UniProtKB/Swiss-Prot annotation:
EC number: 3.6.4.12
Protein name: ATP-dependent DNA helicase II subunit 1
Keywords: ATP-binding, Chromosome, DNA damage, DNA recombination, DNA repair, DNA-binding, Helicase, Hydrolase, Nucleotide-binding, Nucleus, Telomere
NCBIfam families the UniProt entry points to: ku70
Gene encoding the protein: KU70
Main enzyme class: hydrolase
Organism encoding this protein: Phaeosphaeria nodorum (strain SN15 / ATCC MYA-4574 / FGSC 10173) (Glume blotch fungus)
Subunit structure: Heterodimer of Ku70 and Ku80.
Composition bias type Basic and acidic residues, residue spans: 1-10, 44-57
One GO BP: DNA recombination
InterPro entries according to UniProt: Ku70, Ku70/Ku80_beta-barrel_dom, Ku70_bridge/pillars_dom_sf, KU70_core_dom, Ku_C, Ku_N, SAP_dom, SAP_dom_sf
Domain Ku: 274-486
């Protein structure tokens, strides 16, 4: 999810709104990687001929994953902290000379990542010799209780006031203790972390000869998320999918996929009461689950010194005539009525803006869901989910409402005020079923969607349809169906995560190169470009057949539709209208520069530059090519391509 400040509705924002900023404050996030360095985690998978097989050890894959996440955060979240703690190492180093936590090595201290931190981690990932010096496993290993206590101290000293603090634990050992007393100590240390406001996210790794079993130890250590948890109120999979080393899909990709799903904490857009009737309210939270990602201009950077620094900005108002700084108490709001500026006091402005009451979601009726056309959507839909923070029992009532709407195939019509000073809107309350992926894991939780409905002046009139509409034939439809079937995405599902915005990625890549003092890339990596070779291999023959069928159908349609030239029709004896006069046609004057053999090279180049070359007839194109000794075989598209190639060779 995007940051809360990006999710705030922008249509009614105003600088002087007196709203509760506690719900919208910028929430800083601190992530500490704890990566196990044991002999099994350092063991590389056996070599195979499969090009997609693993090449990295689990520890190396985890470090590369942390490196990629640090690269992303240095641009997208410049105020968030990130650190890397290795445990089970032969060396003990916490950057402060403290040797209390044995076999714990703080590779990157919990702090806002700098360019030097990213470079050092990159060198460690790419340089095997340097990695071998640090990644030496201890004989006895590290106690998991020591690791959790060390993480507690790091969070307490480095990020004491952060609203989100998370420990990413990467290991393949599903029972890291020897006796039950060690397990009790570890559970106590984990509870201390949770009491501190930190969360533990486990990223388990299964070896080829051993499956990771959470129930042996980590089910008592890692608490699952629940709807009542304010940091993760949306019910997601309580456990992360186990990554398997040595498979065709690399371990690195599995780890990146798992960590990206938890890389950004879920933050509520709003927390409001949902009123089902008089004196019947429940608590809900709203989330923007799908949002267009745009360029994040989160801060200004000053590059005039020895190193770039984030600018702390401030705003002040100045009078035009005297350049005197105007205090906020001296400012007045004014609106023009009839050419005169009418001023209002701050209290009057507040009364005007809050005339519709407090923020609320109020159900005013129900309608069949079939009454809602697909185009009635004026803004981003908001997903709402129950919250027990303000009203106990909200989850049960919310679930009953959602199931009843699904069963009855109905939707709710609601009066929706998102926040104070916001204009009310009418929205449709649409139920959503739970969606699961092929592994049975939850892809989308059950809940309700708030879809903003248009007012009367938001609806535009459809343009008048064309008089003569050419319709396709059944033969063309059948041939196109074959082409579409060959171009289906895997399992017929579009996954936006596989096709990142190329413009946005290029923007981030340039910023990353500037921040890390690297060479600027030459061209972007655009995964939205069609795979032409694969398309031609799959259905090139079918496309050719479709083109031939299309030309035949169009020729037959032209013969049956367009009138033929023939003798002048005789006048109807019963027609009283006078016959139209024949207009004498003037002989066509040959244009200057055009010879008897058709268009010159310069004229054809001009037509091509205007994008009108495809409007030339086949006869004209063939004659032009024939005069220049070029082949005239093929379809019109081939002729056009041949003409353009000839002009390009001439430099026109």
């Amino acid at each position: 999810m995007a940051d809360t400040q990006d999710n705030r509705p922008g249509e009614e924002e105003d600088d002087d709104e007196e709203i509760d900023e506690s719900a919208y404050k910028t929430m800083k996030d601190a992530v500490l990687f704890a990566i196990d360095v044991s002999p099994s985690m350092l063991e590389r998978p056996p070599k195979t001929e499969d090009k997609k097989a693993d090449r990295d050890s689990p520890t190396s894959a985890a470090l590369k994953c942390a490196y990629q996440l640090m690269q992303q955060r240095i641009i997208s979240n410049p105020n968030d902290m990130m650190g890397i703690l290795l445990f089970g190492t032969e060396k003990t180093d916490l950057k402060d000379g403290d040797s209390t936590f044995q076999h714990c090595y703080l590779l990157a201290d919990l702090d806002v990542p700098s360019a030097q931190d990213v470079k050092r981690l990159r060198d460690l990932v790419e340089d095997e010799e340097e990695a071998e010096q640090i990644l030496k496993p201890a004989k006895d290993g590290a106690s998991i209780a020591t690791v959790l206590f060390c993480a507690n101290q790091i969070f307490t000293t480095k990020a004491p006031n952060f609203s989100s603090r998370r420990l990413f634990l990467v290991t393949d050992n599903d029972y890291p203790v020897n006796v039950k007393a060690d397990k009790d100590t570890a559970v106590t240390r984990a509870r201390d972390l949770y009491d501190l406001g930190c969360t533990i996210d486990l990223f388990p790794i299964s070896q080829p000869d051993q499956t990771f079993d959470r129930s042996r130890f980590y089910d008592d250590l890692v608490y699952p998320t629940s709807p009542s948890d304010p940091d993760a109120p949306i019910a997601v999979a309580t456990t992360t999918k186990v990554a398997k080393s040595g498979e065709g899909i690399t371990l690195l990709k599995q780890l990146i996929s798992s960590i990206n799903s938890k890389a950004t904490p879920r933050r509520a857009l709003f927390s409001l009461p949902l009123e089902l009737g008089p004196d019947l309210r429940i608590g809900v939270k709203g989330y923007i689950l799908i949002k267009r990602q745009e360029h994040a201009k989160s801060c200004y950077v000053w590059v005039g010194g020895d190193k770039p620094q984030i600018v702390s900005s401030s705003t002040s108002h100045m009078a035009d005539d005297t350049a005197r700084v105007v205090e906020k108490t001296e400012l007045r709001k004014a609106y023009k009525f009839g050419g005169d500026a009418i001023t209002f006091t701050p209290d009057e402005i507040i009364k005007i803006r809050q005339a519709f009451g407090d923020p609320i979601i109020r159900i005013i009726g129900f309608k069949p869901i079939s009454c809602l056309p697909i185009w009635t959507n004026t803004n981003k839909a908001t997903f709402i989910y129950p919250s027990e923070a303000d009203f106990i029992g909200s989850t049960r009532v919310f679930s009953a409402l959602q199931q009843k709407l699904l069963k009855s195939k109905k939707m709710g019509l609601v009066w929706f005020i998102a926040r104070r000073n916001a204009a009310p809107i009418l929205s449709a309350l649409i139920p959503a079923e739970e969606q699961t992926n092929e592994d049975g894991e939850q892809a989308m939780p059950p809940g309700l969607w708030l879809v903003p409905l248009p007012w009367a002046d938001d609806i535009r009139q459809f343009p008048s349809p064309a008089a003569d509409v050419l319709k396709t034939t059944d033969a063309l439809t059948d041939k196109m169906r074959i082409i579409i079937e060959q171009l289906q995405l895997p399992k017929g599902v579009y996954d936006p995560a596989k096709y990142p915005n190329p413009d946005l990625q290029w923007f981030y890549r340039i910023l990353q190169a500037m921040a890390l003092e690297e060479e600027l890339p030459e061209k972007p990596d655009d995964k939205t470009m069609p795979k032409f070779r694969q398309i031609d291999k799959r259905c090139g023959e079918y496309i050719t057949e479709y083109g031939a069928e299309f030309e035949a159908a169009f020729a037959q349609l032209a013969v049956s539709t367009f009138p033929h030239r023939g003798k002048r029709a005789s006048a109807d004896p019963g027609d009283d209208k006078p016959a139209p006069k024949r207009v004498k046609k003037e002989p066509k004057v040959k244009e200057e520069g055009e010879d008897d053999e058709g268009l010159t090279d310069e004229q054809m180049a001009t037509v091509n530059n205007k994008g009108q070359i495809s409007k030339q007839t086949v006869a004209v194109l063939k004659a032009w090519l024939s005069q220049r000794g070029e082949s005239t075989s093929g379809k019109k598209a081939d002729l056009v391509e041949r003409v353009q190639g000839y002009l390009e060779g001439k430099g026109l």
